[in-house]
Amino acid sequence: MSAIENFDAHTPMMQQYLKLKAQHPEILLFYRMGDFYELFYDDAKRASQLLDISLTKRGASAGEPIPMAGIPYHAVENYLAKLVNQGESVAICEQIGDPATSKGPVERKVVRIVTPGTISDEALLQERQDNLLAAIWQDSKGFGYATLDISSGRFRLSEPADRETMAAELQRTNPAELLYAEDFAEMSLIEGRRGLRRRPLWEFEIDTARQQLNLQFGTRDLVGFGVENAPRGLCAAGCLLQYAKDTQRTTLPHIRSITMEREQDSIIMDAATRRNLEITQNLAGGAENTLASVLDCTVTPMGSRMLKRWLHMPVRDTRVLLERQQTIGALQDFTAELQPVLRQVGDLERILARLALRTARPRDLARMRHAFQQLPELRALLENVDSAPVQALREKMGEFAELRDLLERAIIDTPPVLVRDGGVIAPGYNEELDEWRALADGATDYLERLEVRERERTGLDTLKVGFNAVHGYYIQISRGQSHLAPINYMRRQTLKNAERYIIPELKEYEDKVLTSKGKALALEKQLYEELFDLLLPHLEALQQSASALAELDVLVNLAERAYTLNYTCPTFIDKPGIRITEGRHPVVEQVLNEPFIANPLNLSPQRRMLIITGPNMGGKSTYMRQTALIALMAYIGSYVPAQKVEIGPIDRIFTRVGAADDLASGRSTFMVEMTETANILHNATEYSLVLMDEIGRGTSTYDGLSLAWACAENLANKIKALTLFATHYFELTQLPEKMEGVANVHLDALEHGDTIAFMHSVQDGAASKSYGLAVAALAGVPKEVIKRARQKLRELESISPNAAATQVDGTQMSLLSVPEETSPAVEALENLDPDSLTPRQALEWIYRLKSLV
């Protein structure tokens, strides 16, 4: 900033601003001046564009006019929300000195830094979504990744081994802000993400990280958290914790532990799979018609966030899953009674985070009190549920009768938004406060009595007593009667139609009232802070209670969904395989106006791969996706949309379904498809569920069929993964004859003239034809084009009548058996008669043949 070059030439106020700005050069500085936050120089220009506010000039400093933009302090939350949504960070600078006693500029300092990943204010957060701060670190052995939800205290770390796993983690967690080292090598992995923050290398040092974490948790080492042997994850976690402390400018008592997330604990889904299955976000980027939109009827925001975490991290521990299933079954008869009470609990988790940060507002404490008031009724309802896990949750949620009583005594029923204006602490809570308030409130009675007395004494019927913030208390007389004002009335203000006066008695009372109001407000703020001190020792138990209430909300919700949507409880088996009777797609069945056609599925070690054929729009993709979604739902402990389900162990779910050009990375549709396919072939195991849809369609017929055949062969024979393989290459329907564990199924359709009816029913065996022209006609392709296509199809079929049945083992000509090209050297030798050559000609031929090789 050019302003700093001639620092001494600036006014004292601008010098103070420039010093503070130098400490926060890369973020906007909101500089408090009276009732406004001002921004200057480049900050003002940026803010005017980002917030669409006026850019003006403020006088001159160092001989130059100062670009300036300002926002009213009482509307700051709205502007902060806009900036945070655009990925910006803001340093809030407040006046901390007293203007009355300050010589020169009032003392100011930055009291907090608002960044997209460290916000806890209710107005700035998405209610039903986690808001994560993350840090990423990389060395020669892999990645370290840490996430922190400052609005709940949830702190996690992991060590993704490779780029694909790291990309999947970024997709799953979707951080609002991402910290990375200044020498981070894989920039293409994070480019284009919101809230990127470059940090110095020293912030990622392992020794500093261990020290920071031990200090935060009050421990000597990190062995108890199971993260001691995760150096890359710790490097990321250390940087992240330091950043959180720097921005909050306070202790973070609600962050009490850190958890290691291990690959073997959950079903792994890569970024493409999460996108294709539309778990919490559809392919267009919205939230409608997703799995979460069907399953999430939770009644608390914290329950909704927990359910989404479950959906993105299906659990592999069958003990946990069976416990959840049993709980859902036990709660089905109680959902109608429990949900209305749970709804009243609200977002206790985030209220507790604001309590820990000492930023909780009066209404937060009122909501906490309301949550506590629901606990006795909840505990009474749960007492009747015959389930050990439910009783464990009931114990964990506690009752907090003492804290409820404290808040009932301390906070009025409907407190104002902020404590700064007073009127928060309830009457009767503090004797001294009540006395000061009585003095201040007595003003109304006094003024009414004074007005009546003075009116009678002077005989002036227009006389009235009032108050305003600038001039204090006054006696007002109309302009027509002002010449009759008594001699002891001192003029204070002249208005167009009236005169305002002061008398010694009124001035004396004004001083007394203002003093008592000031004393009452100061005491009220002190008592409010003391409430934090009384509540914070219970923080750990309160956080456990919030977690139990959120889990109860999720399980009650899943019980309600299971009953309402006619879901069934899946059975877990020991061997790999999935057997589904009458399976349905959980999302499609909700948006269809007609009944959903349920279909069976049978995958086992003896039937590992299904080759799925049938017309476009016939339901192949729906059938494949519903299988993956049923598996995912089973592995969060939920009931599933089917008549009966048996499911074996699954370690990963892969999808290669649909694709679009990745223009940002310069990759074509086919390149995207092949990258996803390579990932599957490298990482799938016999316990993986693999969905392959139309592999090889993005290139020539020969190349595409070759790739599809080889991929199917590899998955069935070598990897032995549970695979659904949809294709339009009818040659692939020969695979079951050539290898074990492969079977054909098809989706039925009926053709009548130029029309086609999709039956959406899965049958054994291969489809008889593709119905491509019928689908094209249905899509509105002009009739003359369809007619010409039928002619061309007949021509092609007459040229190659056996194309659909061609074999790939070489016994007859096929699409895959490309004739070998004859080399020029061989052709020349075939035309050569060695008996007719002279020695010289023979030598020339040797050189000529050499040149042809």
Swiss-Prot record:
NCBIfam families: mutS1, PRK05399.1. This protein is involved in the repair of mismatches in DNA. It is possible that it carries out the mismatch recognition step. This protein has a weak ATPase activity. The keyword DNA-binding applies. PANTHER family: DNA MISMATCH REPAIR PROTEIN MSH1, MITOCHONDRIAL, DNA MISMATCH REPAIR PROTEIN MUTS FAMILY MEMBER. One of its GO terms (biological process) is mismatch repair. Coiled coil: none annotated. HAMAP family: MutS (MF_00096). Belongs to the DNA mismatch repair MutS family. One of its GO terms (molecular function) is ATP-dependent DNA damage sensor activity. InterPro entries: DNA_mismatch_repair_MutS, DNA_mismatch_repair_MutS-lik_N, DNA_mismatch_repair_MutS/MSH, DNA_mismatch_repair_MutS_C, DNA_mismatch_repair_MutS_clamp, DNA_mismatch_repair_MutS_core, DNA_mismatch_repair_MutS_N, DNA_mismatch_repair_MutS_sf. ATP binds at residues 614-621. One of its GO terms (cellular component) is cytosol. SMART domains: MUTSac (SM00534), MUTSd (SM00533). The keyword Nucleotidyltransferase does not apply. This is DNA mismatch repair protein MutS. Pfam families: MutS_I (PF01624), MutS_II (PF05188), MutS_III (PF05192), MutS_IV (PF05190), MutS_V (PF00488). Keywords: ATP-binding, DNA damage, DNA repair, DNA-binding, Nucleotide-binding.
